[in-house]
A protein has these predicted regions:
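An interfacial alpha-helical scaffold signature
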Residues: 1-161
């Protein structure tokens, strides 16, 4: 059965309409940070989780999903040691972990692998994180999309977003 688009899907579609590729990634990362958590396919065990990775042009990409149902959908009929095979990490912690030396370290993120997938290089992720922290995103001040036009800013303010 086809999945109904959620708010994240709508942001992905908005990003696709943007002519500037860097701005597209800003929209996607802004939408990712608005999520309560990032979800990863666990190919390890419950005791020793291991997020699924892939390789694109020699780069280690980490598969990240916008919700747990997408992870289960991606797992399909495959058998994994942990059931359900989902790792859930709060969005701010996941952003930091992807840039650090830990388990989630990667060269790029592959967001929602499949038809509407987006690849976010590590450099873009690091630049976003720096700006996000500089604007107090880490303090929980809310959803932020960098480089909004004044009309977009007005829209968000008028609608209390």
């Amino acid at each position: 059965m086809p999945r109904l688009p959620d708010r994240f899907d709508l942001w992905i579609r908005k990003a696709r309409d943007c002519p500037d590729p860097a701005r597209q990634l800003d929209y996607i990362l802004g939408a990712m940070m608005a999520l309560p958590a990032w979800y990863f396919l666990n190919v390890g065990t419950r005791e020793k989780p291991q997020p699924a990775t892939g390789e694109i042009e020699g780069e280690r990409v980490l598969l990240v999903f916008s919700d747990a149902d997408r992870v289960i959908e991606a797992a399909g009929e495959a058998k994994f040691p942990a059931a359900p095979p989902v790792i859930s990490v709060p969005a701010p912690a996941a952003l930091t972990e992807c840039l650090g030396p830990g388990l989630l370290r990667c060269d790029a993120l592959l967001v929602n692998p499949g038809e509407d997938a987006a690849v976010i290089p590590r450099e873009q992720l690091a630049a976003f994180e720096r700006e996000w922290r500089a604007r107090d995103g880490a303090a929980g001040s809310g959803f932020w999309i960098p480089n909004l036009t004044s009309e977009e800013e007005d829209f968000w303010q008028q609608h209390g977003l």
